[in-house]
Structure formats: structure tokens, C-alpha cells
Regions:
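N-terminal cap/lid segment of alpha/beta-hydrolase-fold proteins
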Residues: 63-101
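Short beta-strand element of the alpha/beta-hydrolase
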Residues: 104-113
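Primarily recognizes the serine-hydrolase "nucleophile elbow" in alpha/beta-hydrolase
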Residues: 171-235
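Accessory cap/linker subdomain of secreted extracellular hydrolases
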Residues: 209-304
């Protein structure tokens, strides 16, 4: 497993990854973990893809590199068509973007962040703009129960959502313009979990890209996020501790570690507190056998990763209030010997959506989450570098 840390210039408010990728000289602070990694050709492609991020730092250096040795043609002609496909009994709908170039090309299937269920969400625009000029098709579909797709999200689980992505892969394999051996998944947040899950469940998938998806279980992630939300909103540490204790009591009931009466008593006492509205808790809870959350919180992304053999890129933002990045890195490092196919990067200054100019208050505002989109030049560059390394991107 290769760990990389990337730090690049900001592109405030920019939705153009091409402009970000083609900026001038880039400077990166490099931390190299001599215990777990070595320099590779990946580190030499661009300054934005330099090894590595680690708790143990053997040395530090500032590296200056020339601009990227290629130019993505942002005016490429792209064929955009609506496509429907079957996933079990459901009909799902999306849009396929295919650059008009010769030969069969790779494709990326976008899997959904929890709060971004439809194909037109700004979170996915950069892929539609960035990848076709690099010779990569992009398929973005409406999640089941959203947009023009059938089904009901409440009746689904992570495995079903991952299987929707696999069904999309099978549909693309029948497209004469797509190389059936070079189709993979991209996902952010929950979509990152789904990308890993989908590729672990289908050996024909070629690669996975997981952005801002923690390597801890969902209950651990949500406790971390709620604690940060309350701190950002100005609550005291004592109030933060009370909120996390309340969430933990409910989760313990769902895991069979606490009886319903005591969990409900703790929850009842919390409902009158000013911080309760920020805890993502209801005023009561279902029995574990009827609770979707009880199923979700048992998902261990590390167990999924252990089943992945294909090339995988995992990226985090160092300023992400939703994800315990450090805890995720520690789990990844602990099993790095098992995952030579996995590369891990941390983008300095990037948040959960790979943006760099969004205030902490706006980052945790649920009403604004559907509007957030990547703007980090380092993220765009790192993504392009990895795709080029995998011989998926056509560059010159």
C-alpha cells in the first residue's frame, strides 16, 4: 500500500478541473514513511502525486516540479445519452458521457454520496467535465428511489446499492464503444464505501476510486462527525460528550449491548437539549431487526477492502469534519502489507467534498451539502495522475 500526501494551489470557486490541472509550477510538502513505502513512478508523474503521508516521518522535503507533461483537450466532442438498465426487478436511469474518439475506451461509474442521489448533483460535474477529454467515459445515474430511477431507498442496503453499480457495469460492457475490461467505480463518502463494495463483489470491475470514505464503521464515523458539528456550532466539550454518549447508548441497544429501557431513558433526557437537533437522532428508535441503521452500522469497510484485488485509489481531505481521517489512516497502515494494490493520498486543506474554500460552518450545514463540489487543484491533479498511471487516461 502506497501512502501519498498532496498539497497544491487552491482554485477558489472554480468548477474547472482542466484549469486546475494545467496551472504552473506546483509545490508539495512531502512526508516519507520509510517503514511502509518507497518512491514509485507515480511520485514522478506530477508534483501533485508525491509520497507520502504518515505518522512516522523519516524526513521532509519541499519538491518543485514542472507543469504536467500533457494537455487535456477540454473541447473534446462528447456524446451524452440517457441510458436505462435493470438491477434486479428495478429500472434505473442515468446519463452516459462518451468522448467521440477512436477505439474502445475505459469508463467510470459514479456511485452516490448519501446526500447526492441524482445524476445532476454538482458533486459529479467535475467528472463529466474532466474525464471525457482524457478519453474516459462517465456514467452517472439516479440512485434507486431518486430522480428517474425506480425503487425505494428505505428498502435497500449497502450491498443492494453496490449491486446497482455492478448492474450498470454489465450494461456498459455491452456498449461497443466501451472496453469491457476497463470499467471501474468512483464514489465519494458513502459512495466510496459502495465503490469498494462493488469491486469486491465483481471480479470483472477494473478499478475503484474512493473519496472521503472512512475506514471505520458508520457508528464511529457519525460520533466523530457529530462531535465536530457541535464544536463548530459553539457547544462546550461537556455538551459534545453528552451528545456522543447519547448516540452511543442508542447504538449499543442496536448492537445488543444495552436494554431498550435504559437507552430510551438516555435518549429522552437528551431530546430537550439544544444540541439534540444536530445529533442525527430521532426521539425513538426501532428494534434492531427493523432498523436500517442497525444494518448499516455493522458495515466494516476494512473487511471489504481485504476482498479487493484490483487497483484502488483512496483519497482523504485533511480538513474533513465528517471523517476521522487519522483513524482511517491508522487502520490502513496496520494492514498495508495486505494491500499492494491500494494507494492512499491525503489532500492538504481539502474538506469532505474536496473543496478548499468552504467555511467549517457551511461544511456541516446539511442544507448546503447538495451544492458542494470539488475545487481542489491537488485533487484534480492526483486523480488524473492515477488514471494515467493505470493507463486509463489518454494524455499527450
Amino acid at each position: 500500500m502506497l501512502f501519498c500526501g498532496a498539497k497544491g494551489p487552491r482554485a477558489p470557486g472554480s468548477r474547472s478541473p482542466h484549469a486546475a490541472m494545467k496551472r504552473g509550477v506546483l509545490r508539495s510538502v512531502v512526508h516519507i514513511d520509510s517503514c511502509a513505502m518507497k518512491r514509485s513512478a507515480f511520485a514522478l508523474i506530477w508534483a501533485l502525486a508525491i509520497c507520502a503521508q504518515s505518522e512516522t516521518r523519516a524526513n521532509e522535503a519541499v519538491v518543485t516540479a514542472a507543469p504536467p507533461p500533457w494537455d487535456a483537450q477540454s473541447r473534446s466532442v462528447v456524446d451524452a445519452r440517457q441510458r436505462t438498465f435493470q438491477s434486479g426487478a428495478l429500472t434505473l436511469s442515468g446519463t452516459l458521457y462518451v468522448p467521440k474518439i477512436e477505439g474502445r475506451i475505459p469508463a467510470v461509474i459514479v456511485l452516490h454520496a448519501a446526500s447526492s442521489p441524482t445524476r445532476d448533483n454538482p458533486l459529479y460535474w467535475h467528472l463529466v467535465e474532466m474525464l471525457p477529454p482524457l478519453g474516459i467515459a462517465v456514467f452517472v445515474f439516479d440512485r434507486r428511489g431518486s430522480g428517474e430511477s425506480g425503487g425505494n431507498l428505505e428498502d435497500s442496503d449497502y450491498a443492494m446499492l453496490a449491486d446497482d453499480g455492478i448492474s450498470a457495469l454489465r450494461m456498459l460492457q455491452r456498449d461497443h464503444r466501451i472496453d469491457p475490461r476497463r470499467i471501474g467505480f468512483w464514489g465519494l463518502s458513502q459512495g466510496g464505501w459502495l465503490s469498494l463494495l462493488a469491486i469486491s463483489r465483481n471480479a470483472q470491475a477494473a478499478f475503484a476510486i474512493s473519496i472521503s470514505a472512512p475506514m471505520v464503521t458508520p457508528d464511529v464515523q457519525m460520533n466523530f462527525a457529530v462531535a465536530n458539528i457541535l464544536r463548530i456550532k459553539g457547544f462546550s466539550q461537556a455538551e459534545v460528550d453528552q451528545a456522543v454518549a447519547t448516540r452511543t447508548a442508542v447504538d449499543d441497544f442496536q448492537r445488543g449491548r444495552r436494554d431498550r429501557a435504559s437507552a430510551q431513558s438516555i435518549l429522552d433526557a437528551a431530546t430537550t437539549k439544544p444540541w439534540f437537533v444536530h445529533t442525527y437522532l430521532e426521539k425513538t428508535f426501532k428494534d434492531p431487526d427493523r432498523s436500517g441503521w442497525a444494518r448499516e452500522m455493522r458495515h466494516d469497510p476494512m473487511a471489504t477492502l481485504h476482498a479487493v484485488r484490483q487497483p484502488t485509489l483512496i483519497i482523504y481531505g485533511s480538513a474533513d469534519p465528517w471523517v476521522p481521517v487519522q483513524a482511517s489512516l491508522e487502520r490502513l497502515r496496520a494492514s498495508s502489507a495486505r494491500h499492494p494494490n491500494v494507494e492512499v493520498a491525503v489532500i492538504a486543506g481539502a474538506d469532505h467534498a474536496m473543496a478548499t474554500s468552504v467555511s467549517p460552518a457551511d461544511q456541516v450545514d446539511a442544507a448546503l451539502s447538495a451544492r458542494q463540489a470539488p475545487q481542489s487543484a491537488a485533487y484534480f491533479g492526483l486523480l488524473g495522475a492515477w488514471l494515467e498511471k493505470q493507463r486509463l487516461a489518454r494524455v499527450r
